């Protein structure tokens, strides 16, 4: 019989799972149909579509893990099932994070304006820089996943072991090492976090300076343009906060192995992770001109607002 905590957790995960698939499925269907009709796709649309697709895979993996936590928690960390979930979760999550970093760099190079020679050199080669990052992200994700698979050699020695008086000190040490490697696995995510933070900071700095300059001439179309800049800054800040929120969830999930209430910590980490996969994708829709127009067009009622898309800071 499910307890109160497990029941609330199950309701939240089912809701987030459905919403996440709808939101990310919408992105894939809109960009995919446009790609199919026009036979071409912009780099930003390709990254956004790939990100949404990987997030759908990640939602299914996390939802499967959530069901195991609720209905069969005592077998959560045992057997080939755990290994498969860990491998697929690691690859899809790591590559998704790098896709976010690539998207932030692309927006930064396309939108921000700085006179530094190094920035201008990168700006003129924005597409090539981001494509190179995508290939590098794929390689790093594979390496990260392979390093995790090496951990299973340790895990195989621990299968069936329990904390009993007969357990040798060697087995205890190996189990601690296995858990520690899971925590240290978060170090693979630090480079992508640094890249994203730098890109978001530069983009906010550039938009902030440009907005201040435009406010001096806040009449007519320039006033509308300044307001569009402020909306873009709010979207970027939302991206950044959600991204930091996402990293917090993985710190909680990884550290849960060393916390007294392991199950509660995992539940909190999973809920935060799935919330991010829904919320951040919604921000992607609101920040993209084409996706936002299509989203508003399918709403069942008129909201009394003008059609979006007067300014295209995140449009493809």
UniProtKB/Swiss-Prot annotation:
Tell me which positions the record assigns to the signal sequence. none
GO molecular function list: bitter taste receptor activity; G protein-coupled receptor activity
Q: List the PROSITE patterns hit by this protein, alphabetically.
A: G_PROTEIN_RECEP_F1_2 (PS50262)
The record places the following residue ranges in the Cytoplasmic compartment, namely 29-50, 108-128, 208-234, 288-316
Localization of this protein:
Membrane
Q: Which residues are glycosylated?
A: 166
Q: Which CDD domains match?
A: 7tm_TAS2R3
The family line of this record is:
Belongs to the G-protein coupled receptor T2R family.
Q: What else is known?
A: Several bitter taste receptors are expressed in a single taste receptor cell.
Membrane topology of this protein:
Multi-pass membrane protein
Entry keyword annotation includes Glycoprotein: yes
Summarizing the function annotation, the protein's role is: Gustducin-coupled receptor implicated in the perception of bitter compounds in the oral cavity and the gastrointestinal tract. Signals through PLCB2 and the calcium-regulated cation channel TRPM5.
Kindly list the residue ranges recorded as spanning the membrane: 8-28, 51-71, 87-107, 129-149, 187-207, 235-255, 267-287
GO annotation (BP), single? detection of chemical stimulus involved in sensory perception of bitter taste
One GO cellular component assignment for this chain's record is: membrane
Identify the species of origin. Answer: Rattus norvegicus (Rat)
Q: What is its main location?
A: membrane
Q: Which InterPro entries match?
A: GPCR_Rhodpsn_7TM, TAS2R
Top-level taxon: Eukaryota
Query: Mind telling me what this protein is named?
Result: Taste receptor type 2 member 3
Residue ranges in the Extracellular topological domain are 1-7, 72-86, 150-186, 256-266
Keywords, in A-Z order: G-protein coupled receptor, Glycoprotein, Membrane, Receptor, Sensory transduction, Taste, Transducer, Transmembrane, Transmembrane helix
